[in-house]
UniProtKB/Swiss-Prot annotation:
One of its GO terms (molecular function) is GTPase activity. Its EC number is 3.6.5.3. GTP binds at residues 19-26, 76-80, 131-134. It comes from Bartonella bacilliformis (strain ATCC 35685 / KC583 / Herrer 020/F12,63). GTP hydrolase that promotes the GTP-dependent binding of aminoacyl-tRNA to the A-site of ribosomes during protein biosynthesis. Residues 55-59 are annotated as: G2. This is Elongation factor Tu 2. Residues 169-171 are annotated as: G5. Residues 19-26 are annotated as: G1. Monomer. Residues 10-201 form the tr-type G domain. Signal peptide: none annotated. The keyword Magnesium applies. Residues 76-79 are annotated as: G3. The lineage of its organism: Bacteria, Pseudomonadati, Pseudomonadota, Alphaproteobacteria, Hyphomicrobiales.
């Protein structure tokens, strides 16, 4: 059978289900595919394949579906640890999330943890599905649970009062038992997701940034840096900044090459070589970035949310303490940094996720939501995301 062409007519949005174990995330995912995509049964989604991201193995199920307005790629994880890893590594980028809460239980510990993680890793918007409403006969009790969920969201700086909450039953939708809380609820949920979760800005429309992977000197032409354009567009003749590791400097791009062909521009996703005016081979290195002037700044101190690998995942065998000094791998290079743990946290065990402060020995072009790996001598021992820049 011929592979069907991916039609890029609708805006594309990445989304995922989050929430406490057994509250119905996977059943809801199955129910959405039933009405908006190729139906995937619970067992097909639950048997999530393993994948590797930043040296960490994560089980994630990917499904796709579409509404009249948009095309969605949806991730669902079988285990709680997979969620933590997924959100911190950005293995599955989320432009928005559907928080599933069982009406019978109300918010539970992982409900809280997933909301906090969504806040820390910068998930822009959440829509709530209050599941299993058929198990609650008391309307006042339902209202109480809804109130609790709104308060919890507000506590973590989401607009709890405005977030859409749809009540229903994923099981009813899968079994066609009660249309009002089944199919109707799932359709209402997706119209709220269409309305409330913003369409992300396409990478090509953002400010130009390219991490430098390699530097060459071409006799008679000057210095060429290669890398994959992360976002935006760079045109021949444009002025750009070289940011990170050393003091920021400006130069002009005098040529762009791709597959040995000359282009007039390079854009997000392209692997290019950029010829730079008046830059010495020694004056630029891997780990710096080329960027639109003023769009990104170098920093050494930041707050991070990190996941530390277990021994079985190839991580450390022992805990670490404040003043731990691993390498932080940003984009294309390792930089040594010193870790300060939050007050009340004596040590971090393998398998923990932790908030920590980091101070790098040289500055890196950095912004909030930037991901990194934590390494010891080239071996990945953790993954993290910049939650706040300090200086």
């Amino acid at each position: 059978m011929a592979k069907s062409k991916f039609e890029r007519t609708k805006p594309h949005v990445n989304i995922g289900t989050i929430g406490h174990v057994d509250h119905g995330k996977t059943s809801l995912t199955a129910a959405i595919t039933k009405y908006f995509g190729e139906f995937k049964a619970y067992d097909q989604i639950d048997a999530a394949p393993e994948e590797r991201a930043r040296g960490i193995t994560i089980s994630t199920a990917h499904v796709e579906y579409e509404t009249d307005q948009r095309h969605y790629a949806h991730v669902d994880c079988p285990g709680h640890a997979d969620y933590v890893k997924n959100m911190i590594t950005g293995a599955a980028q989320m432009d928005g999330a559907i928080l599933v809460v069982s009406a019978a239980d109300g918010p539970m510990p992982q409900t809280r943890e997933h909301i906090l993680l969504a806040r820390q890793v910068g998930v822009p918007a959440i829509v709530v599905f209050l599941n299993k409403v058929d198990q609650v006969d008391d309307a006042e009790l339902l209202e109480l649970v809804e109130l609790e969920v709104r308060e919890l969201l507000s506590k973590y700086d989401f607009p709890g009062d405005d977030i859409p909450i749809v009540k229903g039953s994923a099981l009813a939708a899968l079994e066609d038992s009660d249309k009002s809380i089944g199919e109707d609820a799932v359709r209402l949920l997706m119209s709220e997701v269409d309305r409330y979760i913003p369409t992300p800005e396409r990478p090509v429309d953002q400010s130009f940034l390219m991490p430098i992977e390699d530097v060459f000197s071409i006799s008679g032409r000057g210095t060429v840096v290669t890398g994959r354009v992360e976002r935006g567009v760079v045109k021949v003749g444009e002025e750009i900044e070289i940011v990170g590791i050393r003091p920021t400097s400006k130069t002009t791009v005098t040529g762009v090459e791709m597959f040995r062909k000359l282009l007039d521009q390079g854009q997000a996703g392209d692997n290019i070589g950029a010829l730079l005016r008046g830059i010495d081979r020694e004056g630029i290195e891997r780990g710096q970035v080329l960027a639109k002037p003023g769009s990104v700044t170098p920093h050494t101190k930041f707050k991070a949310e990190a996941y530390i690998l277990t021994k079985d995942e190839g991580g450390r065998h022992t805990p670490f303490f404040t003043n731990y000094r691993p390498q932080f791998y940003f984009r294309t290079t390792d930089v040594t940094g010193i870790v300060t743990l939050p007050e009340g946290t004596e040590m971090v065990m393998p398998g923990d996720n932790v908030a920590m402060d980091v101070s790098l020995i040289v500055p890196i072009a950095m912004e909030e939501k930037l991901r990194f790996a934590i390494r010891e001598g080239g071996r990945t021992v953790g993954a993290g995301i910049v939650s706040k820049i300090i200086e």
